[in-house]
Amino acid sequence: MIQPQTHLNVADNSGARELMCIRILGASNRRYAYIGDIVVAVIKQAV
């Protein structure tokens, strides 16, 4: 489960190393994001 302010490790070749979740889209009063949900995130650390 992912909630706002959660730091995530990135596993792709975009150059980002760490993200922080800001918002869960489509979830007005849901606290957590699950598999398949869309989240808005900011890059906290890059290559």
UniProtKB/Swiss-Prot annotation:
Pfam families: Ribosomal_L14. InterPro entries: Ribosomal_uL14, Ribosomal_uL14_sf. GO terms for molecular function: large ribosomal subunit rRNA binding; structural constituent of ribosome. It is found in: Plastid, Chloroplast. It comes from the Eukaryota. Keywords: Chloroplast, Plastid, Ribonucleoprotein, Ribosomal protein, RNA-binding, rRNA-binding. The keyword Isomerase does not apply. GO terms for biological process: translation. GO terms for cellular component: chloroplast; cytosolic large ribosomal subunit. Signal peptide: none annotated. Its main location: plastid. Binds to 23S rRNA. Belongs to the universal ribosomal protein uL14 family. Part of the 50S ribosomal subunit. PANTHER family: 50S/60S RIBOSOMAL PROTEIN L14/L23, LARGE RIBOSOMAL SUBUNIT PROTEIN UL14C. This is Large ribosomal subunit protein uL14c. It comes from Vigna unguiculata (Cowpea). The lineage of its organism: Eukaryota, Viridiplantae, Streptophyta, Embryophyta, Tracheophyta. The gene is rpl14.
